[in-house]
Amino acid sequence: MAIQQVGARTVLKVLGDVVRYRISPSFRHLILHVTNICNMRCQHCFVDFEEKPNDLSLEEIAGVAGEINDLIWLDIGGGEPCLRKDLAEVVDLFRAREISIPTNGWFPDRITKVAGAIHEKNPGRLIITVSLDGFEATHDEMRQKGSFQRAHETIRRLREIPGLRVKVNTVVCERNSGEILDFMRYVRDLGVDYQSLLLLRGNPINPLYRLPSMDSLRRLGEAMQHILDGYDFGRKGFFRSVLRNYQAVKWETQLQTLERETQVVPCLGGQIHVVVYANGEVAPCEILPPVGSIRKSPLKEVLTSAEWKDAVDGIRRKACHCTHDCNQQENILFDPRTYSKLLGF
């Protein structure tokens, strides 16, 4: 009974978010790149690193928090976020129902310390996502020699923090597609809360990295979903089953997007979703170019500018399409047409 009540409350909260957004649209999802510094140059990374990073100060980020703060999702990005020494203070500036921080796992001590500090103030809301792209040889080739073992140690230590949700992100590309199913079973046995499969996107540092063929992705899909169904996603009862269904809906939506070369579910980029980069530039999503900077204008001026409106109009007209997980999440959850599938009907 208690689990059913928790599930019902969660569903009602999500439905309330959707209704409020439809009545009065507002930004509920912020991707905040806290640093452009990274200790790796992963072969499949799409981030355009600056030679001389000029990261936002804590005061400048506080200005962002003062203008956009009542969030469902706060996604921290980079660079390698844990290289920012005041990361915990940055997170403290925001009110968010769910906080997600990715890491390449290279610094187990530093990551575990900051995760523990943030989790203590945000119990049940923090997810630490560690990147693992394949077994050791594959992962180290795609990222950096020795990175597999360090990421593995980071996962082990994070799992020792009671109540902290730990996730693995895996970029799916030709290089790891041959071992992906066995690797997914390996990750499941690590005891993490779940694994996200991210289709390669953007313009990788190494242009030889590409997506597997559509036939390969279709063949892998059912077996992948069967493995993902073994996770509880850090949840219980009804909402756990919804999250399992979501993985299947997301995968099918992404494949159809690639096949049709258009948006399958209308994209809310620039409407519910905003990206602030470490240098202050602002974009409607990580795929499209920036259209302003908080170092030149207050954030609200950027978000109400003619340039921003033009970018959003282009998204609404389906002038662009992508498989970006961060976008697909809100697109699916805020589209009532997906609810029958999410509920398993």
Predicted regions, residues:
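Secreted/processed peptides and extracellular or luminal domains of membrane proteins
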Residues: 44, 48-51, 273, 291, ...
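Flexible mid-to-C-terminal extensions adjoining Fe-S/redox cofactors in radical SAM and related proteins
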Residues: 13-14, 264, 281-345
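Radical SAM enzyme [4Fe-4S]-AdoMet core and its adjacent flexible, acidic
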Residues: 1, 93, 97, 124-269, ...
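Soluble, non-transmembrane catalytic domains of enzymes that act on hydrophobic metabolites at membranes
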Residues: 29-56, 60, 71-77, 166-174, ...
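Short, charged low-complexity linear segments at domain edges
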Residues: 7-27, 247-254, 290-307
